[in-house]
Amino acid sequence: MENISALHAVKEELTYLNQMFPLSEFVDHFDTFADGSFPSHWHNEFELQIMLKGNAEYRVNGTRYMVSEGSAIYIAPEAVHMMKALSSNAIGYNVVLLPQFLTNLFQVSNCEKYAAPLTSRHPEAFVITPERKEGHAV
């Protein structure tokens, strides 16, 4: 797996079907990527990828995360990241959302503190597993 460098990472520009709801979602079939990996990139959105099948290794700002089937990874806005399948036929469901959308939504309902963990750049990433009982502190 390559060493992540912000100098070599490409900014991924995502498009939205509806500008009022800036969300993109797609299914990643890792076998369709060269060598089963998606190269270093970053974007303004935060990302949540759920492993539907198989296992994958993620590198986020140089830190390694292992994500297994049934688990997910949260990646903060502007974090440089890449992913590589660790098993054949690995599939992930991916959702990316502009943090400003959540900030605006929660401001309207006076719940800004709930948006803070998803709109900040720290933590850069964390893995969510079915066994994990605790939530993220607000």
Model-found features: residue ranges?
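A hydrophobic/aromatic-rich effector-binding and dimerization subdomain
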Residues: E2-S24, V80-V138
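Generic protein-terminus/edge-of-domain signal
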Residues: M1-M66, A72, E112, P123
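Exposed loop/turn and edge beta-strand positions of beta-sandwich/beta-sheet ligand-binding modules
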Residues: W42-N44, P77, I91
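Tight coil/turn sites that cap or link beta-strands
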Residues: F33-A34, E69-G70, E78, L98-Q100
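Short amphipathic alpha-helical leader/targeting segments
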Residues: S68-E69, K84
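A short, compositionally biased micro-patch
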Residues: M51-K53, A76, L86
